[in-house]
């Protein structure tokens, strides 16, 4: 996938490549201090900000890095059936990159992007148990308990519930195996969030996700790469939570 800005709705984009690319750029700058890597970070931040805040699909700002499900899945997108949305757990890679970029640059666009995605997740990213009941299917692994959380495999502010359920039933049976990973975007959004009601919502979500910190969940090998996904970027979550408890902004 070429590295660069998101310029058109049918452009191939994955949150994973974009996030890991940003992390690599930050790491290179931290190790070398070379300006070319700092310039690379600034370029990537500009691309991400433009994508999130001024998406070329013209559907407005919802807080995600909205792209095409069909292109994401390797298919040609018929405009009438394209599902404009994003992968919650792949976007964790972007949030991870943004946090490290914040530590390296203090760029003021970063809190805006992170809190916007946190709000998006609260509105569109998590599957309401009522939806599972109405669909007659529960995609969760019982290891997280009866109130275990699960994000959509493909989330959207614009798709119908029927469209999202179809993707979930086809691809998303292991979505909750990424719950530990998903604590990072929630905690990072909570760290930068200034609205008291949003802070409370994110606190509740973190508490709900804590049930996935379970040995039975850790034993599940739904995908061989799951351990890496879940644990690569979330070490800072415990630090975030200490800041919340201490009353830090």
Feature map (PLM): residue ranges:
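Glycan-recognition and catalytic cores of secretory/periplasmic carbohydrate-active enzymes
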Residues: 1-249
């Amino acid at each position: 996938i070429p590295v660069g800005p998101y310029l058109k709705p049918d452009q191939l984009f994955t949150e994973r490549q974009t996030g890991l690319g940003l992390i690599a750029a930050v790491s290179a700058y931290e190790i070398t201090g070379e300006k070319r890597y700092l310039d690379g970070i600034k370029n990537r931040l500009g691309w991400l900000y433009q994508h999130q805040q001024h998406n070329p699909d013209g559907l407005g700002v919802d807080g995600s890095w909205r792209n095409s499900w069909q292109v994401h899945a390797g298919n040609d997108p018929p405009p009438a059936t394209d599902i404009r949305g994003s992968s919650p757990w792949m976007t964790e890679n972007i949030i991870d990159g943004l946090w490290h970029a914040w530590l390296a640059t203090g760029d003021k666009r970063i809190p805006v992007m992170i809190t916007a995605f946190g709000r998006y997740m609260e509105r569109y990213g998590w599957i309401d148990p009522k939806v599972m009941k109405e669909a007659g299917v529960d995609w969760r692994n019982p290891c997280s308990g009866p109130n275990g959380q699960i994000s959509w495999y493909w989330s959207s502010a614009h798709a119908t519930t029927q469209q999202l359920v179809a993707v979930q039933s086809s691809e998303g049976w292991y979505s909750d195996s990424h719950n530990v990973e998903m604590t990072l975007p929630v905690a990072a959004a909570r760290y930068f969030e200034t609205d008291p009601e949003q802070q409370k919502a994110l606190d509740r979500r973190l508490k709900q996700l804590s049930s996935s910190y379970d040995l039975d969940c850790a034993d599940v090998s739904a995908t061989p790469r799951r351990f890496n996904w879940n644990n690569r970027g979330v070490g800072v979550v415990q630090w975030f939570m200490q800041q919340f408890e201490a009353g830090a902004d």
